[in-house]
Amino acid sequence: MIFVTVGTHEQPFNRLVEAVDQLKGSGTINEDVIMQTGFSTYEPKYCEWHKLLPYAQMKEKVAEAHIVITHGGPASFIMPLQIGKIPIVVPRQLQFNEHVNNHQVEFTKAVAERMGNIIPIYDITQLGNAIQCYAEFISSMQSNGLHTNNAQFNSTLEKIAEKMFIRKEA
């Protein structure tokens, strides 16, 4: 199952909701899709959807999902990260009137670059590929060993220790 959440921001996120619905309708997505559509005005035709879900149900859907797709709000994509899942993150963009500014784009880019534990999608036409290649993406992310905070901390600490204790030969 794929779970999609657009959060609770009052502006619609039709671009994401419609894109996922069309991918399901075209057969690009073969598994069940459950969406939390928030204030989006597009009503999915091929996916199960709910305007809003209670927090407990959100956690349950995230835990059950094979793939979690979120908007760029930190609370939404931190939830799957906390249980070891790598989310596909599609930030809301000002140019599509999905938010009041581009802070979700900026934050998503920063997290993707610094942490390397999310799959960012800025161009919605790339979403189908990210879903189809999800297993390969997460496999490559996990093989670099930097998909968790602990792994990143350990890696950074190791580099610092090496610099401190490796002496140059005279």
PLM feature spans:
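Nucleotide-activated sugar donor-binding and catalytic core shared by glycosyltransferases
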Residues: M1-A170
